[in-house]
Amino acid sequence: MSEPLLHVVLYQPDIPQNTGNIGRTCVAVGAKLWLIRPLGFRLDEKHLRRAGMDYWQHLDWEAVDSWSEVRERLPDRRVWCLTKFASRMVWDAEFQRGDILLFGSETRGLPESIRDENSANNLKLPMHDVVRSLNLASTANTVVYEAVRQFGGLT
């Protein structure tokens, strides 16, 4: 398999439908999806079908036990943490092929220790204060396609 365009990492995702939508985006652009356990759902065939992931066989993905395991496997990759606590906007980043886009769980976000470790590369999408957070799949799709836009497309 060729080198992934991006590495999309979901830290302890809770909702299978969000993971399914993000997986579909990864297939569409040639990104690899990493899932960090524990997950809020099972990865068996029945649950994947229920989440609409019938294309799962086309997805380059891996489930691992920790963020440190991802870093050990991808030591030289630049990490972008998506968090509402960031001061920089997604549009201010200059993405590179092979970057890691790290997203927290729907209910807890990313641990502060991970955000602090990558503080120079914490990014957010703009939103009014009355909105607590954006949907994980919507955010991931927006950020992935901003990177694709910066790359000049998929070619």
Language-model regions: role of each:
Residues 1-155:
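Post-transcriptional modification and biogenesis factors for structured RNAs
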